[in-house]
């Protein structure tokens, strides 16, 4: 009850306050009070009423609310402003007195700036131009005083405020005038006057209008008045502090003195600014006060204007705020009405205000009622308003003269208040102490009074959030209002022009009719005269009749002329009225442009509007975008009008007056002004409002990096380093897949949240003003600098357009929805069954988009690095792609065509460049390049249009024949006219056809501005681009809606529809011209004279000439369009420039044609443009086009495997693979192998659809590993080829392949025959158990490929980046499995995660808890632990610490192994034992311990050599993956079994054709282990053509090697050494492996299995084991670099083997004799000074060698490299040395790429702080920041920020260091070097953050915004379902006799309900089969995204630290750079310091 009473009282209080304020304002206006008097009366009256109300409330209520009385007594500034604006809007012009009240209220901060902006937006009518002009003046002054507070000090101060001469006013306001006598107007005088007036008031709230007096004035006031002489007023600055406070005087209850001691309560207004004004504090004697009470108004001239000189000269009415005498009644009394409205009327003003807003056309009173009182006002915008200039500061002499004149005037005006400008010196002092920004604060005398601690500490997060939103909303509404003013002017101008055109057409028709009548009369007169002369020459009556006819004719002519004159006069009057209205609107629009230009030049204002795009996604921001787009449309229309009529008017024979009138109608003065002066304003606002991409700051580093004075090498090096590492490096190419940031596409979210259907849009652009129809912002992100909005889509009848604003952070809805997104989610309608199905369909669509977004997992890291460098260097898209493609072609020219580097570079060029280009198009929203044109359909449309025109000609001819038959008297004349009409129609139809052809070409070649950029938001604004094309502006968006993914075939019908629509538009235009010509001809045909017919012929000829001229002009415009498109289409332009290089002709393969072919098939290029650019490829392009339009049907089958020509073949291959699923028959191995050999050939040899084929292979769904073991074995056999691995590496599928292999090995390796037979009933029979007997067989092939990838090719053990990626992927997979696993398995998996995350040395703890019972429970632990131990190279334990030795794995396994023989029975027993007891992972993880025990027994002479070889043979024979483990163990151990004497060894290489076996041993000193190890080369076996280690019968024809002497040799390496005692056992082991391979006993099949397989299929089955031999060879040869090179074959297989070669290459001898410091200097100097592109592999070799010489000390090598780079920085002069940037990029690559991520903490936290004192110039600071940036980019730091706490802490320390440095710079002294270093580093981090994370990875699967909303929808659906079920149960209970029934009946009904529900669920699953799975998927995605979310680089800091850093940036730079560090713009609402 109390709360209800409180709400009711507050509502009543607000209503009463509003009425009180309105009453006080009206009474003040009637009494003609000055603003100061009005403010006193306002406060007194408002406070008295509130005190009375408060006393009544206190008597009724408790005393708990006493503390809130003062807060409730304050005046609501918004209500006050709204009342003033309402009252100002009454009448023909606003009352100047009310204007002065409003200005004064703003000046004393009674109305805040934010409140004023919002109130003006709500309560101002643009249509009432005279009223709104005054508001614009106030807005201009407000913006000026915020922007330049020191230059605009007296804008709001009411100077020379005169008192009324009326005695009534003097009698009523004596006390007020006495208080105003003192010019200083001290607070004490105010309080005394208030005390005299209101002696019973406890506390009187007033506002301190001016600053407190100076000490001298305060002391003088205390002395006697007689001792004081009147002094001239001294200027005293008034500073409105930040925060600005409204002061309230409160009585101190403790005071007992009669003079009430007042306290001031200060409350901050929401918007804090800094404004300074001046006040004069002087005192006068009592005699002067009494005389001045009767003094008159200030002196005026004859016109009633004041003679005072101010910065803004206005009349007395405008300045003083006093209406003229016409508004007063008799004897000077105020009239009872205020501009026709009684001041005592109710609150109907607001209703009238709403009616005024609805009226868009001026009333007669408004149009004619020019303000008489403001007509003499001299505006500051009076430069004829064509080129308004900003306010200029006057010279010191002029200021002194003005001050002297003002002082002389003020001596005669002591009764008025005068505020003067300070002197120039004081202005300069103020400029030094304060900055023109919103955040600076200055001291003010207002804050001399004390403030209570309670009011100061009220600022909380809620208030700051409200303040933040309030500021953003106020500035967006201000900009919206200003754009609406300009839009309204264009609308009115079009309306007036249309009226004038219609009037002119009517006048012309009337004139033509009158002329025709006159001509008829004259002809009749001539005929009568001729008859009278011939026949009746002597008859006087006839003569009299002829004279009467002449008189009648003359009278008719005179009447017609009089009518024409009257019409012309009426039209002139209307035109004058319209012109007057238009002139006022023009002035208002120019004022709006001036205010917008101030906003645009101020970074703070502009940033507040920019931030509103993230906060106000729909309602408020939509109102700002729509008028801006409407203005751009009108600008475009004016451009069209400016270009078109020049040809028509010149060619046509028009009179001079008509030409001038038409030209004035077409040329808009505001458009000319915008084109001349405000072009950059619209470009900048377009970038802020419409761009999806966030605008990134580009500081001085941009001009440094891509300066014109530098050579091309400085740009090339960084790109070349990254591309070379991508092609030749052995690192995983896609790393950010799991850590992708949560960004949602706006297009995706629209389809979910917009549950209602979008309405069709109208064709008219004017409809976009009300509801936004017809405008699409989604694709307008071209970054064009042109003035015309050529990229704005005009809605057609069949297009559903919606506006998408800023797809980066927050998703947008369509503009048709008026409610914001949150309210729409909360107010979802109750889901009826059709709505639920619609929702589910939307969810399914979104999940399809999520799955399609997974294609971004194949995006390489190099693309993000290149994008970062692109934005930093400021390269355009053409320059960016041209640089990359040029580097790739240069590599192709230098490489050998038979080398692996050439093949991989070619693959990268053909597939990754189109992939990158498609990503650029899709993610930046520029769909203009997706030109999926169909020339055949376009030609069909042309033919249809031509047929229609021919039909029209036939119809015209038939009509003309009918006209001939009807007119028998004038056959000849009519025939001539008809012929002319036919000629006209034929010519016009030809023009139609020509225009259709031209439009078809322009639609194919969409315009993209040359300066436009897809990938970069460049700040290079080209203001000189004034020329725009007219045809392309209407045809440039034909294909904007056709953004297509790489993986899908596009729909070409959309393009055809868009082309036909544009052609129809052109036809309509030409048809209108034809209709006009035909109408003129029909009017002229009504005349029956020969002269008129001749005139018609002339007119028709002129029309023909006009149409021909139009044709020529259209052709010329289309030629210009072609020229523009040459520069606009990015990839076409790049290929054209690349084709000009003559060195490309040396390349054997025509790579340009291959690239063009792939781009065409991916629908990324314009076919017609390519034909014009490459005429040599015209036939090839036509054939490709025809193949795309009519693709051949696929005829592929298992018996017909030839080539892949189309996507249909890819689909057919997918079907063939799916047909092989779930087929375990071993006889199908030949079919599988044949199909995958065919696939293998297409993976090795590139073709057009290679990426599609890989997508099919890696994105196959619903494959069960257990039921498809044979198929997976065949696939992994194909993937084991090194050339296939190269292809997979280029396309970015390697990391995914590794994870698939881990999943396969886990499923195969964790099962045994015992577990499978117990769990699955199918395998109980012996016939079905053959697969389970060969578990090791299926495990071997994927395990072999996994081992090869991880250990050999990608060297995970020595590559930290690959190691960390695998670890993160393993932890991610375990987290996913733990969510779906039971609680028992959860405990075991979590232990393994903890082991990995803790990185503990678990060397001796692997077998501590090994029991026989844990084999079935801890399989996953063994799998993860073995992978981790294998990666970390931990030592293997030998079973020590096991409690029960008899149950350990080693004991049981060795016992069975030693007890078994090589006989059939013993092998069978061992097979059954091992497969029953041990899984594959058990053997893999524990076999090294077994080997250790075997060789340890051999060393102790416990067993003999024969037993060792026997056990090895048994292992090799049945466990096929054991050789990998055995030889890996042999290469790492120190057993005496391998120790040989260090005797000299000789190596010979021979070529043989027979099978020989040689035993080789050699010694190597491995730098990795620093021990002498023994390895053996493989036995010499015959090699097939692909070089694999095969048996004599096997061969593979899919690959070929280089031929020597025309034959394919088989290479055998024979390494002979001195025999020793211990060579024999090793030789026996190798011989055992060789014999097993030769005799096909490497894997022993069971008899039952052999009985199922035929001979041919058995051979194919054995071939699957060929890659195992190669893996063993690589294990044996990889440490032996020399022998590896002598083999030659393996180095030619893949570029991934290059890393193995580089690890053991010997460095040059020069470096071995140098110190490490000199060696590093030598390496860097040689690299920089080489003219040819250097070899990066040699650089890597040299750096690793130097690092090894430093004993792998990380700190030393980082210090040496950094010192060398810093020496280069200090040696660089101000003009930039030639290799300065090149050296920075090289140093960053050495530290980040070669040394690694570990170098960054040393560089950022140690070296840079110590060397910062040496950075003295700005160039040094820029170079140092770029060096840090290059190190971070090359080290993949973005990944480690997510995973490594050490890297996070180092970056956090570095940011805090930058913050402290910037603070110290401000406090101590500015240092140019450190300032530029700090700002450049921050800017580069912003570019790195946006280019690498937010821009491209928001489409990833971890899409939190999308998934959160889907999750909310699903949860609501589930809750609604539960509610419905509860309702049904309640209804059933109510129906069943009040719920009384037996237990048995309840039980039966429950069972029946369950059955019914089960049946319904099954039916729903049939209808919607995947809905429940979709819900589970979304939930898991939701949990995953909440678990791990990617943060930006700056989000390592907390919100407070971020805010502190942004404040430091703001003090050194601008506001825009300060807020750019916030990745999530919602965090800005918690930053109170930034917005205070």
Curated annotation (Swiss-Prot):
Bias (Polar residues) ranges: 778-787
Composition bias type Low complexity, residue spans: 212-229, 273-291, 300-311, 387-451, 501-539, 547-580, 754-770, 788-808, 928-943, 965-999, 1017-1118, 1385-1419, 1565-1584, 1594-1608
Compositional bias segments (type: Basic and acidic residues): 260-270
Region named Disordered: 51-70, 159-184, 212-451, 501-580, 754-840, 928-1124, 1375-1419, 1565-1608
Localization per Swiss-Prot or TrEMBL: Nucleus
Disulfide bridge map: none
UniProt keyword Electron transport present: no
Biased composition (Basic residues): 944-964
UniProt keyword ATP-binding present: no
One Gene Ontology term of the molecular function aspect: transcription coregulator activity
Residues forming coiled coils: 505-584, 943-977, 1915-1968
PANTHER family associated with the record: MEDIATOR OF RNA POLYMERASE II TRANSCRIPTION SUBUNIT 24
Name of this chain's protein: Putative mediator of RNA polymerase II transcription subunit 24
Native organism: Dictyostelium discoideum
Lineage of the species this protein comes from: Eukaryota, Amoebozoa, Evosea, Eumycetozoa, Dictyostelia
Gene label: med24
């Amino acid at each position: 009850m109390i709360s209800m009473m409180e709400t009711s009282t507050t509502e009543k209080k607000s209503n009463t306050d509003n009425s009180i304020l309105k009453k006080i304002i009206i009474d003040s206006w009637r009494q003609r009070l000055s603003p100061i008097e009005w403010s006193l009366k306002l406060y007194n009256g408002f406070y008295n009423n509130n005190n009375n109300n408060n006393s009544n409330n206190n008597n009724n209520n408790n005393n708990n609310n006493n503390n809130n009385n003062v807060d409730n007594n304050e005046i609501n500034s918004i209500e006050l402003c709204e009342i003033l604006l309402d009252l100002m809007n009454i009448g023909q012009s606003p009352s100047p007195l009310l204007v002065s009240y409003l200005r004064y209220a703003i000046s004393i901060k009674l109305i805040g700036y934010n409140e004023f902006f919002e109130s003006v937006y709500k309560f101002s009518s643009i249509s009432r131009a005279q009223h709104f002009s005054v508001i614009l003046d106030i807005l201009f002054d407000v913006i000026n005083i915020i922007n330049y507070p020191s230059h605009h000090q007296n804008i709001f101060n009411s100077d020379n405020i005169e008192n009324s001469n009326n005695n009534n006013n003097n009698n009523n306001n004596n006390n007020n005038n006495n208080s105003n006598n003192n010019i200083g107007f001290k607070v004490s005088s105010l309080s005394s006057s208030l005390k005299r007036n209101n002696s019973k008031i406890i506390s009187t709230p007033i506002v301190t209008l001016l600053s407190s007096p100076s000490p001298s004035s305060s002391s003088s006031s205390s002395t006697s008045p007689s001792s004081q002489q009147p002094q001239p007023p001294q200027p005293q600055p008034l500073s409105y502090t930040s925060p600005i406070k409204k002061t309230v005087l409160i009585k101190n209850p403790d005071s007992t003195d009669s003079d009430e001691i007042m306290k001031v309560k200060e409350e901050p207004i929401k918007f804090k600014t800094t404004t300074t004004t001046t006040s004069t504090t002087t005192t006068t004697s009592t005699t002067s006060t009494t005389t001045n009470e009767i003094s008159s108004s200030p002196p005026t001239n004859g016109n009633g204007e004041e003679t005072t000189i101010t910065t803004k000269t206005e009349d007395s009415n405008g300045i003083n705020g006093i209406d003229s005498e016409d508004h007063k009644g008799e004897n000077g009394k105020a009239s009872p009405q205020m501009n026709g409205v009684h001041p005592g009327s109710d609150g109907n003003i607001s209703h009238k205000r709403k009616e005024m807003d609805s009226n868009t056309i001026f009333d007669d009173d408004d149009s004619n009622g020019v303000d008489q009182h403001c007509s003499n006002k001299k505006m500051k915008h009076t430069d004829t308003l064509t080129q308004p200039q900003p306010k200029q500061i006057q010279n010191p002499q002029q200021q002194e003269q003005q001050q002297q004149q003002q002082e002389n005037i003020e001596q005669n005006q002591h009764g008025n208040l005068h505020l003067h400008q300070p002197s120039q010196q004081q202005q300069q002092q103020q400029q030094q102490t304060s900055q023109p920004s919103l955040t600076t604060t200055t001291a003010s005398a207002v804050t001399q009074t004390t403030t209570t601690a309670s009011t100061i500490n009220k600022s909380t997060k809620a208030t700051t959030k409200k303040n933040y939103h309030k500021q953003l909303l106020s500035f967006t509404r201000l900009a919206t209002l200003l754009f609406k003013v300009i839009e309204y002017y264009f609308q009115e101008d079009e309306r007036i022009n249309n009226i004038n055109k219609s009037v002119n057409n009517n006048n012309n028709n009337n004139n033509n009719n009158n002329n025709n009548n006159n001509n008829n009369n004259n002809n009749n007169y001539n005929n009568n005269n001729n008859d009278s002369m011939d026949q009746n020459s002597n008859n006087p009556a006839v003569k009299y009749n002829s004279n009467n006819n002449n008189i009648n004719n003359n009278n008719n002519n005179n009447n017609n002329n009089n009518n024409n004159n009257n019409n012309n006069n009426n039209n002139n009057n209307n035109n004058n009225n319209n012109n007057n209205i238009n002139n006022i609107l023009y002035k208002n629009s120019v004022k709006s442009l001036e205010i917008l230009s101030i906003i645009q030049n101020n970074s703070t204002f502009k940033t507040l509007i920019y931030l509103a795009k993230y906060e106000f996604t729909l309602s408020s921001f939509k109102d700002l975008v729509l008028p801006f787009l409407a203005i751009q449309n009108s600008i475009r229309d004016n451009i069209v009008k400016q270009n078109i009529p020049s040809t028509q008017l010149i060619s046509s024979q028009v009179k001079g007056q008509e030409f001038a009138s038409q030209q004035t109608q077409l040329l808009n003065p505001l458009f000319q002004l915008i084109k001349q002066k405000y072009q950059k304003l619209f470009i900048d606002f377009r970038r802020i409002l419409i761009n999806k991409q966030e605008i990134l700051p580009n500081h001085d580093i941009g001009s440094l990096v891509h300066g014109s004075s530098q050579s091309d090498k400085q740009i090339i090096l960084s790109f070349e380093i990254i591309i070379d590492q991508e092609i030749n490096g052995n690192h995983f190419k896609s790393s950010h897949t799991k850590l992708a940031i949560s960004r949602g596409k706006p297009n995706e979210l629209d389809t979910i949240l917009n549950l209602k259907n979008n309405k069709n849009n109208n064709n008219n652009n004017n409809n976009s003003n009300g509801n936004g129809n017809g405008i699409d912002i989604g694709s307008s992100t071209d970054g064009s600098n042109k003035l015309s909005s050529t990229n704005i889509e005009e809605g057609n009848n069949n297009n559903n357009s919606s506006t998408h604003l800023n797809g980066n952070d927050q998703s947008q809805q369509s503009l048709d929805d008026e409610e914001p997104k949150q309210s729409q989610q909360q107010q979802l309608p109750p889901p009826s069954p059709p709505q639920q199905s619609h929702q589910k369909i939307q969810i399914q669509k979104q999940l399809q988009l999520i799955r399609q977004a997974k294609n971004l997992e194949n995006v390489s890291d190099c693309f993000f690095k290149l994008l970062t460098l692109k934005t930093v260097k400021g390269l355009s898209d053409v320059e960016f792609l041209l640089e990359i493609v040029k580097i790739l072609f240069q590599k192709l020219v230098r490489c050998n065509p038979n080398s692996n580097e050439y093949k991989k570079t070619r693959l990268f060029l053909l597939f990754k460049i189109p992939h990158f280009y498609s990503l650029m198009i899709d993610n930046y929203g520029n769909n203009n390049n997706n030109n999926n044109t169909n020339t055949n359909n376009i030609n069909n449309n042309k033919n249809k249009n031509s047929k229609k025109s021919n039909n029209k000609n036939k119809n015209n001819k038939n009509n003309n024949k009918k006209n001939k038959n009807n007119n028998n008297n004038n056959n000849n004349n009519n025939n001539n006219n008809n012929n002319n009409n036919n000629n006209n129609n034929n010519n016009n139809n030809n023009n139609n056809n020509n225009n259709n052809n031209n439009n078809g070409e322009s639609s194919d070649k969409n315009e993209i501005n040359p300066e436009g950029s897809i990938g970069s938001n460049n700040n290079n604004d080209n203001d000189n681009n004034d020329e725009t094309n007219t045809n392309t502006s209407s045809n440039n968006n034909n294909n904007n809606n056709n953004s297509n993914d790489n993986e899908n075939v596009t729909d070409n019908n959309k393009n055809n529809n868009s082309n036909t629509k544009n052609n129809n538009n052109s036809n309509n235009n030409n048809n209108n011209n034809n209709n006009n010509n035909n109408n003129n001809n029909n009017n002229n045909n009504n005349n029956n004279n020969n002269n008129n017919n001749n005139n018609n012929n002339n007119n028709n000829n002129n029309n023909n000439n006009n149409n021909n001229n139009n044709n020529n002009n259209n052709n010329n415009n289309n030629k210009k369009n072609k020229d523009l498109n040459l520069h606009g289409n990015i990839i076409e332009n790049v290929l054209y420039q690349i084709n000009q290089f003559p060195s490309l002709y040396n390349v054997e393969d025509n790579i340009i044609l291959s690239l063009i072919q792939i781009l065409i098939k991916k629908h990324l290029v314009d076919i017609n443009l390519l034909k014009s650019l490459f005429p040599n490829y015209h036939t090839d392009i036509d054939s490709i086009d025809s193949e795309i339009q009519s693709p051949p049907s696929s005829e592929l089958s298992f018996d017909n495997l030839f080539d892949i020509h189309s996507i249909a073949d890819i689909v057919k291959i997918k079907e063939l693979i799916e047909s092989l699923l779930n087929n375990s028959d071993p006889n199908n191995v030949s079919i599988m192998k044949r199909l995958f050999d065919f696939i293998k050939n297409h993976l090795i040899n590139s073709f057009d659809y290679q990426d599609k084929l890989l997508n099919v292979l890696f994105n196959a769904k619903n494959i069960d590993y257990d039921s498809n073991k044979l198929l997976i074995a065949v696939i992994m056999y194909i993937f084991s080829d090194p050339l296939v691995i190269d292809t997979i590496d280029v396309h970015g599928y390697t990391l995914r392949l590794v994870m698939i292999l881990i999943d396969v090995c886990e499923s195969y390796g964790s099962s045994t025959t015992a577990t499978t037979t117990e769990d699955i009933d199918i395998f109980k029979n012996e016939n079905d158990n053959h697969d389970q007997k060969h578990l090791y067989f299926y495990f071997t092939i994927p395990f072999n490929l996994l081992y090869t990838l991880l250990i050999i090719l990608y060297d995970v053990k020595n590559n930290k980046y690959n190691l960390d990626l695998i670890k993160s992927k393993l932890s991610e997979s375990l987290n996913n499995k733990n969510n779906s696993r039971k609680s028992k398995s959860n405990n075991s998996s979590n232990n393994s995660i903890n082991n990995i995350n803790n990185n503990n040395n678990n060397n001796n703890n692997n077998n501590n808890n090994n029991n026989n019972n844990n084999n079935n429970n801890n399989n996953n632990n063994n799998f993860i632990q073995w992978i981790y131990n294998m990666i970390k190279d931990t030592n293997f334990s030998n079973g020590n610490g096991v409690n029960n030795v008899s149950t350990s794995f080693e004991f049981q396994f060795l016992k069975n192994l030693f007890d078994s023989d090589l006989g059939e029975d013993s092998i069978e027993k061992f097979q059954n034992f091992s497969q029953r007891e041990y899984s594959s992972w058990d053997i893999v993880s524990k076999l090294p311990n077994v080997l250790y025990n075997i060789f340890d027994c051999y060393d102790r002479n416990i067993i003999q050599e024969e037993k060792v070889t026997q056990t090895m043979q048994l292992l090799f024979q049945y466990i096929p993956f054991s050789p990998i483990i055995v030889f890996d163990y042999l290469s790492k151990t120190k057993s005496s079994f391998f120790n040989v004497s260090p005797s000299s060894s000789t190596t010979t290489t021979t070529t043989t054709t027979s099978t020989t076996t040689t035993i080789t041993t050699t010694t190597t000193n491995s730098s990795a282990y620093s021990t002498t190890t023994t390895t053996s080369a493989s036995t010499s076996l015959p090699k097939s053509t692909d070089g694999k280690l095969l048996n004599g019968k096997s061969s593979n024809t899919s690959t070929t090697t280089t031929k020597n002497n025309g034959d394919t040799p088989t290479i055998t390496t024979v390494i002979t050494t001195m025999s020793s005692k211990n060579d024999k056992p090793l030789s026996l082991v190798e011989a055992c492996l060789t014999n097993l391979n030769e005799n096909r006993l490497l894997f022993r099949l069971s008899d039952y299995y052999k009985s199922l397989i035929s001979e041919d299929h058995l051979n194919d089955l054995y071939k699957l084991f060929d890659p195992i031999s190669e893996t063993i060879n690589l294990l044996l040869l990889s440490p032996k670099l020399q022998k590896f090179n002598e083999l030659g074959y393996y180095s030619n297989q893949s570029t991934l083997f290059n890393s193995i070669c580089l690890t053991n290459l010997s460095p040059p001898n020069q470096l071995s004799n140098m110190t490490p410091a000199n060696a590093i200097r030598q390496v860097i100097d040689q690299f920089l000074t080489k003219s040819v592109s250097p070899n990066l592999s040699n650089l890597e070799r040299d750096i690793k060698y130097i690092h090894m010489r430093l004993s792998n000390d990380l700190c030393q090598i980082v210090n040496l490299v950094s010192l060398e780079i810093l020496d280069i920085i200090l040696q660089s002069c101000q003009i930039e040395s030639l290799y300065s940037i090149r050296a920075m990029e090289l140093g960053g690559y050495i530290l980040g790429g070669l040394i690694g991520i570990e170098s960054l903490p040393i560089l950022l936290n140690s070296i840079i702080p110590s060397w910062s004192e040496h950075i003295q110039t700005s160039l040094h600071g820029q170079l140092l920041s770029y060096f840090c940036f290059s190190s971070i980019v090359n080290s993949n730091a973005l990944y480690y920020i997510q995973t490594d706490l050490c890297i996070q802490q180092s970056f956090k320390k570095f940011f805090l260091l930058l913050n402290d440095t910037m603070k110290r710079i401000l406090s101590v002294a500015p240092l140019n070097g450190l300032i530029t270093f700090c700002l450049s580093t921050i800017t580069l981090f912003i570019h790195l953050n946006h280019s690498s994370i937010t821009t491209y990875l928001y489409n990833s699967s971890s899409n939190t915004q999308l998934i959160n909303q889907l999750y909310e929808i699903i949860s609501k659906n589930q809750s609604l379902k539960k509610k419905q079920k509860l309702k049904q149960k309640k209804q059933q209970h109510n129906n069943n006799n009040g719920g009384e029934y037996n237990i048995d009946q309840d039980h039966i009904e429950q069972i029946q309900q369950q059955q019914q529900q089960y049946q319904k669920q099954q039916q729903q699953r049939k209808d919607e089969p995947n809905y429940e799975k979709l819900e589970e998927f979304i939930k898991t995605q939701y949990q995953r995204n909440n678990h791990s979310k990617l943060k930006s680089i700056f989000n390592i800091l907390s919100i407070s630290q971020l805010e502190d850093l942004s404040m430091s940036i703001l003090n050194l730079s601008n506001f825009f750079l300060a807020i750019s560090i916030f990745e999530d713009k919602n965090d800005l609402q918690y930053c109170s310091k930034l917005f205070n």
